[in-house]
């Protein structure tokens, strides 16, 4: 087996775990950075596929709860829009972000 493949695979899996858990990045941002580093798309897909969906969703909720404390807005809609924009900047997928934000009590 090619050494580069094994190292890329290990690197991608560790990168995904670290960025989701410590940095609070979403799948889109992680994918972009791994592509920039020259990791094969199949390896990226495999590494991202090992992410626990429920834990990923909970991480997004935690991030938004923290951010909600500092967001200033004139209306509930505006606050939710700002929270959604923040989550998408961190690389979370739009449909998931809006699903979570709609449930939010601001």
Q: Which residue ranges define each predicted feature?
A:
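An alpha-helical, amphipathic repeat domain used for nucleic-acid recognition
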Residues: 1-106
């Amino acid at each position: 087996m090619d050494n580069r493949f094994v190292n890329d695979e290990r690197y991608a899996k560790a990168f995904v775990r670290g960025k989701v858990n410590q940095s609070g990045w979403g799948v889109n941002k992680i994918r972009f950075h791994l592509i920039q580093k020259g990791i094969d798309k199949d390896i990226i897909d495999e590494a991202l596929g090992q992410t626990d969906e429920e834990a990923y969703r909970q991480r997004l909720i935690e991030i938004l709860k923290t951010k909600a404390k500092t967001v200033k807005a004139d209306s509930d809609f505006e606050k939710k829009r700002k929270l959604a924009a923040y989550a998408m900047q961190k690389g979370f997928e739009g449909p998931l972000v809006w699903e979570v934000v709609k449930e939010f009590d601001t």
